[in-house]
Amino acid sequence: MSMSDPIADMLTRIRNAQAVEKASVVMPSSKLKVAIAKVLKDEGYIDDFAVTEQGGKASLTIGLKYYAGRPVIERLERVSKPGLRVYKGRNEIPQVMNGLGVAIISTPQGLMTDRRARATGVGGEVICYVA
């Protein structure tokens, strides 16, 4: 059975794994999921990620990060969904928690944070909010 929203599935797997304090979470891999994991690692929300191939299927393993026994990611919310895409121009890019959080945006230059998109002067599809 095909999945209608693999990005929402990825975010839900991360939320569920952190709720039970797992050290890592494994999911099917795709280029977009790897790009999201790279942004999360660059921003310090996850420890590490790795793509492994087994039996012709690629898997993405994400190492979760905790601080003082609590998950580093407090909020992980999907914004643009398959049924309702959310696009923002370069002057409309949202701030998450007044700049404390990050919005991950898909732009013509690739996936990037809201701060980088504002600095570059590009808009795009708002994938998710992370705080």
Curated annotation (Swiss-Prot):
Keywords: Ribonucleoprotein, Ribosomal protein, RNA-binding, rRNA-binding. It comes from the Bacteria. Pfam families: Ribosomal_S8. PROSITE patterns: RIBOSOMAL_S8. GO terms for biological process: translation. GO terms for cellular component: ribonucleoprotein complex; ribosome. GO terms for molecular function: rRNA binding; structural constituent of ribosome. Part of the 30S ribosomal subunit. Contacts proteins S5 and S12. One of the primary rRNA binding proteins, it binds directly to 16S rRNA central domain where it helps coordinate assembly of the platform of the 30S subunit. Belongs to the universal ribosomal protein uS8 family. This is Small ribosomal subunit protein uS8. It comes from Ralstonia nicotianae (strain ATCC BAA-1114 / GMI1000) (Ralstonia solanacearum). The lineage of its organism: Bacteria, Pseudomonadati, Pseudomonadota, Betaproteobacteria, Burkholderiales.
